Amino acid sequence: MGRKWANIVAKKTAKDGATSKVYAKFGVEIYAAAKQGEPDPESNSSLKFVIERAKQAQVPKHVIDKAIDKAKGGGDETFVQGRYEGFGPNGSMVIAETLTSNVNRTIANVRTTFHKNGGNIGAAGAVSYMFDNTGVIVFEGTDPDHIFEILLDAEVDVRDVTEEEGNIVVYTEPTDLHKGIAALKAAGITEFSTTELEMIAQSEVELSPEDLEIFEGLIDALEDDDDVQKVYHNVANL
């Protein structure tokens, strides 16, 4: 499945850490999920999933509660999901997933970010066909074969199960992510460090130090945009 997940997580953690910007983005995602259904995670599975992910990212409880309270209070903002695809230097590819209350603002900002940082924004589908939408579940463990058997018995469509640095990493079909989580919980595994839908590059490129500096500036600028929730790329040495 490409780069080791442990390496991806280590670089991401070193890059953004538990910052207020991460909290704010989760706040928006929680609010949007609560507005689309009931503001109660026990009756709104989408909201429950976002809250679980927020806790994995160490988002404080007061941030989660504030977003839910805002939805309960009848906040009138409507958020729309989007995806923008583009290219960086020397065969590098980028996908930016957004959640915004102002689509025109987001389109303009993302396009400007690409152009100012050595990239070019592409049409829908220009890049995403080179990535696989994949469910990723990570938790402590050292026996991938046993975990594979658990998931197989539960008829979860699994792409791969690996052991990386004391962690089990499960890759599922995107439609079976929640089924996989449920099967693991039923088997007594309840603590997860990651439960995400991710776009994983089918192949990767390595950039020269000069190109890497340009590309890193592009990724940083996209991640700094308040409307951008996730950024995926195919650069192995970032």
UniProtKB/Swiss-Prot annotation:
InterPro entries: Integrase-like_N, TACO1_YebC-like_2nd/3rd_dom, TACO1_YebC_N, Transcrip_reg_TACO1-like, Transcrip_reg_TACO1-like_dom3, Transcrip_reg_TACO1_YeeN, YebC-like
Pfam short name (any one): TACO1_YebC_N
Subcellular location: Cytoplasm
Keywords: Cytoplasm, DNA-binding, Transcription, Transcription regulation
GO biological process, one term: regulation of DNA-templated transcription
GO MF annotation list: DNA binding
Keyword DNA-binding: yes
GO CC, one annotated term: cytosol
UniProt family annotation: Belongs to the TACO1 family. YeeN subfamily.
The protein, known as: Probable transcriptional regulatory protein LACR_0237
Record organism: Lactococcus lactis subsp. cremoris (strain SK11)
Lineage: Bacteria, Bacillati, Bacillota, Bacilli, Lactobacillales
